[in-house]
């Protein structure tokens, strides 16, 4: 059955819908553009067929500028009163713009009173669905009651959006719940390109979506974005009155940004909320505050029966409803590639999250950064609630979250209400849970016992936890560090550390009701940190038992010690095992003020108990666990304990200093190798000009040079590369002798593959002579020879980018000479097959010398480098092949040679660290002492005056490679 929508006006309400109807009414939707501002009349349509209706689009349908808000019979543009309603887009556009109504669902509504769950409303197959500036206002009854109406789309039936390309709900407004969509069950899935709820607002609850049974945002490949939505009371973007909300499998991420309400800045839920297996989940700049409000309607809506809880959950509020009696309602975030809560704000509690039961686990990365609240800068757990944090697939980090109650803000990650607790606190091997902001807790109820929390449990559904839990003041500014509250965490819970590591760093304090430690776990403390029991009225017997305590040597400053303090009146402190020592960094002993001298009575550990019950019977102070640092100050420790004060101190005996690899500076001596390598490249480019020719010539050559030395046991990898130009002149001064003069410039850079980078500007000059008659009278042993001297002066600059120290910079100049003397025996050929002109066996003596003077860096940790030089003598032996092309006078040359280094003084220099007087030798790379040389050049005459040429070469050693490429042109006179 088919009919046109323009004639399909049904207003009567039919019998209740039936699930097993024989046929569905099929309606063909026209391709139209209805614009009320042009006077075109829109046929408001009501569907009431209990068999259900299938609307099939034949094209795009645009509906704009309609207003029936003042009508006593105000209605939706499309209304359904019976049967299921399916709207099939067929790739078309479905658009509503500037629609105003005083009915529920300004654009579309489906209100079924009997068995609504059997009559779903569905939208599928649209290229675009647009609901822009649709407004649902209030209406009054004959009894003068004001009824607030809701949403652009309203349904008492399940609602489904599936397989659409783009969905946009923008700038919609309503007096009732949900400005964009309100329904019992809302499912949006398989959206392909865009899913955006932007700028929607409700005077009451649910700025974009309101659901009473379920909200599902699942399996969308499009980004899911809720932006700048707002409400007058709850749920800036989403309001869930019961049931559950599932956001899962969204491939391009989920983003809630700039949403606002009085509670639940982005989401307010009285049902379960689950985020799972999305690519990215981000909540940014959402706010929950009593000051957040849209203008109230006139007259205002009836006040709620329960006083609103305002200013809670900057991003998400998730608790059971006040009535009926609370049931298990939880917020779960798991399986995400990344989770980010950034700069969300709540005026009261939970800058990011506020919930009775919250679980965050199995995410690859979780970050709470810069969130703010009165209590619980990132997370707040109300009375008797619970929180589970598991870093089992990635790290969890809390940093720069703030609590602002009055006066100066303080750092605060989590706040536990009265009797609230951790249900799970753990990290698996290789992952860490970082608390750079402390945890705060309300006091226990008078009759309540402290809950027991197993930290890093041995066995769980996720396997054994053996990762690290860190409490640290590392990211505090100097001003923040001066306030103890910024680094003091309080947990009114009994902690049992079963596995992994609990680390207290950078001045952090952890107060717990009771603390015990399993033998397979480790407690690491910095000097200046404290592990203590709480000292409130509800904790009279809290105790601390440690069996594997480790002190971080990085943190020692000679004044502060790690402190273990049992503050409860009857509690005992028991410590056993061997005191461990750890270095968090390989250069921990580079503390000049601390370790550059022998030390006595260095504070290490203080053990305290209000009851004076401190047991150290099985506590050992042996130094077997101390491993000498491979770098920095070398020495030995000796520890003692005062049995009266229970204070552990240490004596340090300095034995020497070993520089960290970052200080070794191989680039300084290697700069001499760079000079020699550059001059060899210049020599090859000059020889490639083709010097055994009559007449005079002037050539200009572009030079490129690349060198890499491999990492060896004695030296790290080294790379040098550069480019420049050579201007060369040539003249034959006698029939048997020629002279060549050249000069040029190179621009180079080098690096040592760790922290050193160098740049240089090289100026050079070269002199060449060639003799083509016998060097020994009538002897034909050498019938020709060449000689060349090349000099360079380079201006060097090196920057050392230390990992922890300020960058070091220095500059200086190097001088380098390269002398070459060659004897050869040309053999003239006339080969028609290879067209070879000649073969020239040769032997050459090459002497290279480079030197630099003293050098000093310009930082407090700067080094002083002494004089250094390089001397290398090589004797290349090889053969040169010359070939004429069939289009003479073009010719080609190939050189193959073996070049052993018969003598070498490898470059090095004495290095001093003035800040402590330590000295060592900086050593350059020791290249393999033999090399294979292969070069090729080509010359092409453009005319009798102009010639162009190219040259390439490689120098292959077992531990290094050098490559050159030169292109030039020559003028003959």
Swiss-Prot record:
Its main location: secreted. Keywords: Cell outer membrane, Cell wall, Membrane, Secreted, Signal, Transmembrane, Transmembrane beta strand. The gene is pmp13. Residues 691-973 form the Autotransporter domain. Residues 284-303 are annotated as: Disordered. It is found in: Secreted, Cell wall; Cell outer membrane. Pfam families: Chlam_PMP (PF02415), ChlamPMP_M (PF07548). It is a peripheral membrane protein. The lineage of its organism: Bacteria, Pseudomonadati, Chlamydiota, Chlamydiia, Chlamydiales. InterPro entries: Autotransporte_beta (IPR005546), Autotransporte_beta_dom_sf (IPR036709), Polymorphic_membr_middle (IPR011427), POMP_repeat (IPR003368). This is Probable outer membrane protein pmp13. The keyword Lipid metabolism does not apply. Transmembrane segments: none annotated. Belongs to the PMP outer membrane protein family. Residues 1-24 form the signal peptide. It comes from Chlamydia pneumoniae. GO terms for cellular component: cell outer membrane; extracellular region. The keyword Signal applies. It comes from the Bacteria. Residues 284-293 have a biased composition (Polar residues).
């Amino acid at each position: 059955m088919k009919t046109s929508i323009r004639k399909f006006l049904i207003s009567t309400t039919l019998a209740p819908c039936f699930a097993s109807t024989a046929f569905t009414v099929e309606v063909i939707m026209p391709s139209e553009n209805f614009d009320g501002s042009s006077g075109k009349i829109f046929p408001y349509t009501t569907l009431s067929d209990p068999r259900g209706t299938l609307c099939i689009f034949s094209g795009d349908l645009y509906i704009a500028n309609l207003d029936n808000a003042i009508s006593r019979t105000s209605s939706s543009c499309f209304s359904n009163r019976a049967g299921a309603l399916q709207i099939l887009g067929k790739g078309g556009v479905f658009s509503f713009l500037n629609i105003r109504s005083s009915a529920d669902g300004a654009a579309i509504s489906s209100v079924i009173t009997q068995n609504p769950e059997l009559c779903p409303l569905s939208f599928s197959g649209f290229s675009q669905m647009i609901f822009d500036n649709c407004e649902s206002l209030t209406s009054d009854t004959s009894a003068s009651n004001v009824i607030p109406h809701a949403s652009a789309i309203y349904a008492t039936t399940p609602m489904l959006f599936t397989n659409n390309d783009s969905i946009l709900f923008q700038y919609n407004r309503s007096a009732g719940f949900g400005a964009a969509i309100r329904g019992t069950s809302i499912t949006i899935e398989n959206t392909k390109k865009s899913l955006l709820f932007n700028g929607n607002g409700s005077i009451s609850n649910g700025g974009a979506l309101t659901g009473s049974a379920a909200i599902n945002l699942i399996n969308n490949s499009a980004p899911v974005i809720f932006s700048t939505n707002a409400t007058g009371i709850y749920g800036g973007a989403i309001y869930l009155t019961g049931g559950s909300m599932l956001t899962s499998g969204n491939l391009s991420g989920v983003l809630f940004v700039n949403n606002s309400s009085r509670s639940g800045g982005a989401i307010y839920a009285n049902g379960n909320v689950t985020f799972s297996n999305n690519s990215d989940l981000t909540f940014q700049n959402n706010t929950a505050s009593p000051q957040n409000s849209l203008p109230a309607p006139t007259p205002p809506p009836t006040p709620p029966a329960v006083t609103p809880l305002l200013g809670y959950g900057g991003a998400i509020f998730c608790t059971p409803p006040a009535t009926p009696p609370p049931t298990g309602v939880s917020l779960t975030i798991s399986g995400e590639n990344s989770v980010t809560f950034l700069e969300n704000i709540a005026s009261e509690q939970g800058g990011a999250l506020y919930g009775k039961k919250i679980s965050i686990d199995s995410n690859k990365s979780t970050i709470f950064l810069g969130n703010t609240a009165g209590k619980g800068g990132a997370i707040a757990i109300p009375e008797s609630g619970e929180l589970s944090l598991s870093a089992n697939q990635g790290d969890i980090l809390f940093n720069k979250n703030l609590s602002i109650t009055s006066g100066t803000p303080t750092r605060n990650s989590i706040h536990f209400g009265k009797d609230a607790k951790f249900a799970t606190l753990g990290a698996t091997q290789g992952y860490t849970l970082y608390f750079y902001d402390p945890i705060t807790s309300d006091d226990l109820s008078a009759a309540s016992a402290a809950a027991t929390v197993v930290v890093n449990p041995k066995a769980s559904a996720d396997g054994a936890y053996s990762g690290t839990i860190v409490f640290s003041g590392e990211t505090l500014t100097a001003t923040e560090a001066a306030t103890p509250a910024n680094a003091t965490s309080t947990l009114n819970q009994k902690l049992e550390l079963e596995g992994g590591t609990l680390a207290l760093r950078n001045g952090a304090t952890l107060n717990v009701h009771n603390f015990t430690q399993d033998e397979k776990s480790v407690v690491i403390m910095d000097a200046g940190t404290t592990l203590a029991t709480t000292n409130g009225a509800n904790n009279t017997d809290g105790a601390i038992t440690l069996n594997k305590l480790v002190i971080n040597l990085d943190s020692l400053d000679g004044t502060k010690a790690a402190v273990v303090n049992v503050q409860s009146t009857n509690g005992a402190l028991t410590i056993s095992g061997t005191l461990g020592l750890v270095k968090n960094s390989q250069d921990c002993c580079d503390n000049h003020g601390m370790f550059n001298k022998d030390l006595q009575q260095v504070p290490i550990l203080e053990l305290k108990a209000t009851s004076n019950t401190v047991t150290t019977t099985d506590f050992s102070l042996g130094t077997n666990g101390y491993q000498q640092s491979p770098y920095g100050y070398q020495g030995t420790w000796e520890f003692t304990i005062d049995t009266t004060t229970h204070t552990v101190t240490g004596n340090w005996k300095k034995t020497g200093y070993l520089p960290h690899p970052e200080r070794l500076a191989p680039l300084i001596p290697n700069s001499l190798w760079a000079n020699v390598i550059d001059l060899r490249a210049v020599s090859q480019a000059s020889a490639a000009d083709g010097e055994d020719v009559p007449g005079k010539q002037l050539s200009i050559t572009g030079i490129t040079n690349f060198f890499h030395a491999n990492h060896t046991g004695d030296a790290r990898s080294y790379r040098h590369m550069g480019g420049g130009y050579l201007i060369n002149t040539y003249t034959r001064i006698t029939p048997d002798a020629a002279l060549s003069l050249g000069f040029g410039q190179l621009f180079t850079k080098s690096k040592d593959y760790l922290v050193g980078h160098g740049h240089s500007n090289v100026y050079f000059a070269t002199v060449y002579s060639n003799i083509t008659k016998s060097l020994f009278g009538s002897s034909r042993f050498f019938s020709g020879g060449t000689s060349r001297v090349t000099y360079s002066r380079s201006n060097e600059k090196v920057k050392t980018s230390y990992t922890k120290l300020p960058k070091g910079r220095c500059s200086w100049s190097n001088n380098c000479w390269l002398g070459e003397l060659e004897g050869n025996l040309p053999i003239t050929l006339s080969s028609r097959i290879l067209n070879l002109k000649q073969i020239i066996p040769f032997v050459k003596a090459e002497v290279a010398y480079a030197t630099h003077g003293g050098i000093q860096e310009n930082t407090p940790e700067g080094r002083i480098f002494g004089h250094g030089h390089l001397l290398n003598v090589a004797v290349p032996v090889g053969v040169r092949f010359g070939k004429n092309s069939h289009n003479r006078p073009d010719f080609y040359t190939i050189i193959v040679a073996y070049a052993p280094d018969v003598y070498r003084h490898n470059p090095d220099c004495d290095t001093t660290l003035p800040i402590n007087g330590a000295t060592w030798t900086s050593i350059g790379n020791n290249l393999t002492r033999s090399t294979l040389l292969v070069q090729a050049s080509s010359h092409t005459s453009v005319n009798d005056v102009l010639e162009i040429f190219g040259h390439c070469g490689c120098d292959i050693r077992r531990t290094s490679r050098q490559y050159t490429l030169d292109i030039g042109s020559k003028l003959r006179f």
